[in-house]
């Protein structure tokens, strides 16, 4: 089962599969990321406490 990251972007609830996430970085207490949105680059952010473990693992690997 693939992990999904739920986040809000411009007031809209979104969800992205962790396998589509390309780049992850920390901004204060938020975890920001870019992901493949059907050929375009999508952006998202989630608070550190709401981030799934797999997303935090990607952050540590950089």
Curated annotation (Swiss-Prot):
Q: Name the domain of life.
A: Archaea
Keywords attached to this Swiss-Prot or TrEMBL record, sorted alphabetically, are:
Cytoplasm, DNA-binding
Q: Where in the cell is it found?
A: Cytoplasm
InterPro entries (alphabetical) = Chromo-like_dom_sf (IPR016197), DNA-bd_7a-e_arc (IPR003212)
Q: Which GO terms describe its cellular component?
A: cytoplasm
Q: Which SUPFAM superfamilies match?
A: Chromo domain-like
Q: How does activity depend on pH?
A: Highly stable from pH 0 to pH 12.
The molecular function terms in GO held by this entry are:
DNA binding; RNA endonuclease activity
Temperature optimum or stability note: Hyperthermostable.
Subunit text: Monomer.
Record function comment: Can constrain negative DNA supercoils. May be involved in maintaining the integrity of the genome at high temperature.
Q: Which family does it belong to?
A: Belongs to the 7 kDa DNA-binding/endoribonuclease P2 family.
- Please report the name of this protein according to its UniProt entry: DNA-binding protein 7b
Phylogenetic placement of the source organism:
Archaea, Thermoproteota, Thermoprotei, Sulfolobales, Sulfolobaceae
């Amino acid at each position: 089962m693939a992990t999904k990251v739920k986040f809000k972007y411009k007031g809209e609830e979104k969800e992205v599969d962790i396998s589509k996430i390309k780049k992850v970085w920390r901004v204060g207490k938020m975890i920001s990321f870019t992901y493949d949105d059907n050929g375009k680059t999508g952006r998202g952010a989630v608070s550190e406490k709401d981030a799934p473990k797999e997303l935090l693992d990607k952050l540590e690997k950089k």
